[in-house]
């Protein structure tokens, strides 16, 4: 069946690696991670994104639906590629940039917090993501495109 609801959110921000998320004690976020998280949450609270997230929340039924998430991380060419060819070490590992972003978009712990520490996100456990695709692309600037699809829960 075709996707009942699909929304695209573009965040004009750099990807952030989970490797840089926590201090050495592994319990406290670094200042950079806190600032990045706040920037994402502020972007999610923008009128156009707030509307899209609300539409997804209103439609989604955890007994009937799952999420398919598509993430595209855009990097300037000089960051993604090395001068001599190949992929630069400055282009993060995809699996390391997925989780921090997914948590901010999905998790209920951010839903009722005041800005910039929270946003009216999807307010649901990310366990409902059953299909996740991510990729790195060259772009004019850093940005992240998040495509959120609500799919019918498979019956098998």
Feature map (PLM): residue ranges:
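Acidic, proline/glycine-enriched N-terminal capping motif
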Residues: 1-156
């Amino acid at each position: 069946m075709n996707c009942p609801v699909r929304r695209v959110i573009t965040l004009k921000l750099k990807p952030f690696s989970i490797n840089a998320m926590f201090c050495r004690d592994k319990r406290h976020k670094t200042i950079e991670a806190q600032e990045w998280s706040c920037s994402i949450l502020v972007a999610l609270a923008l009128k156009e994104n707030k509307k899209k997230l609300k539409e997804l929340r209103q439609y989604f039924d955890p007994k009937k639906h799952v999420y398919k998430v598509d993430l595209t991380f855009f990097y300037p060419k000089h960051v993604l590629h090395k001068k001599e060819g190949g992929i630069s070490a400055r282009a993060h590992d995809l699996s390391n940039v997925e989780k921090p972003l997914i948590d901010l978009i999905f998790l209920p712990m951010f839903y009722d917090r005041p800005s910039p520490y929270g946003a009216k996100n999807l307010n649901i456990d990310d366990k409902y993501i059953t299909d996740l695709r991510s990729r790195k692309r060259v772009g004019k600037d850093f940005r992240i495109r998040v495509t959120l699809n609500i799919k019918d829960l498979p019956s098998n």
